[in-house]
Amino acid sequence: VQALKRFVSKGGHFAISTGRGREFTRPLVEQLPVNFPCVIFNGGAIYDYSTEEYLMEIDLPAHSSEYIQEVMDRFPQIAVIAVDADHYFDIDGGAAEHYGDVYPNKSTVKAAMSDLKSKLMKGLMLLHPQWTEEFMAFVEEKKFPGVRFVPTSPHLIEMLPEHSSKGNALQKLMEKKKIQALTEQYLKLM
């Protein structure tokens, strides 16, 4: 952290690029000398914590809730967390009930899919690893338009906007801020 503070004090720009949402990234922003907009939601958004505003957002398609429902109908053993710009919604309480040991997020809000009215940024599918192959085969066969499914851990598959990525968002951020060069350092914080 001291090296980052020195870097920033000499005019460097430091940002975070993460799959987390705005409020789940905020504790990291408060711990580190972040002085530049951050890439969040796996590249689905760029958020400036200094002005508290989104500079870019890529939402899931409007009909993505139908995709989630179809996946839930086909795989009733999974739990789904639907994520909008502000909240993580534990659909029907399945994550807390069945996957609390692998996704112990206490900040989720229990909701039904039909209750969600806001645009979604991503969907998190929690499942036991033995279902991953069958799940991925199902979504690949369905070819849901406008989204992609990415396994990100043994118990988690994320549904993301088709063209969002951290790399694409970093490119957009560089263009917006007229940055000519970028370096990336992976930093794992506990």
Language-model features: locations:
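Active-site phosphate-binding/coordination module
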Residues: 2-96
